[in-house]
């Protein structure tokens, strides 16, 4: 039988990484410059491992092989099979990430042996004073202008800069130039893909002391060169209710800001639900015929992520005081 599942985080030391992730999550590590914590991952070679309960030690791929649609839902399993379709991260940028872009499904499939593209979203958990993000172009340019600006190191002149604060949300469809910049601590929800085309990296060295590879030409085919006016996602928090944030074909994400229990019906969802705690603590309780009644409730605290199986018919998040969580599933 299944239950709400926690996984061991995969910590990634990166040249731009900071020291906030371990204390935020309440864990100890010998690693430094931890830029990312992969909370749930089906990326080959980086598959998440169940942390506790009767399934402890199994990878997310092994769960899918054994439980199939009970884990992810019928329509999800039909589309993605034994690859878990979303990658969930916490990101701590002590300095600026490279300016980059990700391909869409069509381009990634042709170029990268059938891989998926990468559409993603950011939720700002914390931001230093004057922190900002880069997302999208501030004016429409041509591919030829792009190449010249990259060669001249002036590409940053046409990338839209957004001052950010706690709670800000950005949706980044594949093809949108972007960068997380220093002083930002973020929850990221994305398609399962680790394909990144690095456009500009400030001339810095990697952790190995060598310049990091750029992918200027590969990126040119992936970039959406149009400028838009809606890079930041506006929303109004509904306390003790479901606050929709982002809905796209790859994920539907909402915010729950709770001071009292909230129960949501899941029977018609036909999808797993991911619960990411960004602040506070509490519990997640699920019901369903294939849910283990002895282990249907799991604790949840800041920095933890829980996978609610698709076979659950309801989910109740109960705060201890106040809790903020992101929930994400596939429609």
What would you call each of these model-derived segments?
Residues 81-83, 91-96, 127-130, 176-196, ...:
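Ligand-binding loop in jelly-roll beta-barrel domains
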Residues 88, 97, 114, 120-123, ...:
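His/acidic/aromatic-lined binding-pocket segments of jelly-roll/cupin-type domains
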Residues 158-171, 185, 287-312:
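Short acidic-glycine-tyrosine-enriched beta hairpin
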């Amino acid at each position: 039988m299944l239950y709400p599942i926690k996984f061991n985080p995969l910590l990634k030391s990166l040249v731009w990484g900071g020291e906030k992730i371990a204390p935020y999550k309440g864990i100890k590590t010998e690693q430094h410059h931890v830029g990312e914590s992969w909370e749930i991952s089906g990326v080959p070679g980086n598959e998440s491992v169940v942390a506790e309960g009767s399934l402890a030690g199994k990878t997310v791929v092994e769960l899918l092989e054994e439980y199939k649609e009970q884990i992810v839902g019928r329509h999800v399993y039909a589309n993605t099979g034994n690859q878990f379709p979303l990658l969930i991260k916490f990101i701590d940028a002590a300095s600026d990430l490279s300016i980059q872009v990700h391909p869409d499904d069509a381009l990634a499939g042709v170029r990268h042996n059938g891989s998926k593209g990468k559409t993603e979203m950011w939720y700002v958990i914390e931001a230093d004073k004057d922190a900002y993000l880069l997302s999208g172009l501030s004016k429409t340019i041509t591919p030829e202008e792009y190449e010249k600006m990259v060669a001249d190191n002036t590409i940053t002149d046409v990338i839209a800069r957004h001052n950010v604060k706690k709670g800000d949300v950005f949706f980044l469809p594949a093809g949108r130039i972007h960068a997380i910049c220093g002083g930002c601590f973020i929850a990221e929800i994305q398609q399962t893909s680790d394909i990144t085309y690095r456009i500009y990296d400030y001339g810095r060295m990697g952790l190995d002391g060598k310049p990091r590879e750029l992918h200027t030409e590969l990126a040119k085919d992936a970039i959406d060169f149009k400028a838009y006016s809606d890079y930041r996602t506006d929303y109004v928090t509904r306390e003790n209710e479901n606050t929709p944030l982002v809905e796209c074909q790859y994920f539907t994400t909402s915010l729950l800001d709770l001071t009292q229990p909230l129960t949501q019906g899941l029977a018609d969802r036909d999808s797993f639900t991911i619960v990411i705690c960004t602040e506070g603590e509490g519990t997640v309780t699920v019901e369903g015929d294939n849910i283990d009644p002895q282990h249907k409730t799991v604790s949840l605290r800041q920095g933890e992520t829980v996978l609610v199986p698709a076979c659950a018919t309801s989910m109740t998040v109960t705060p201890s005081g106040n809790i903020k969580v992101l929930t994400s599933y596939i429609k």
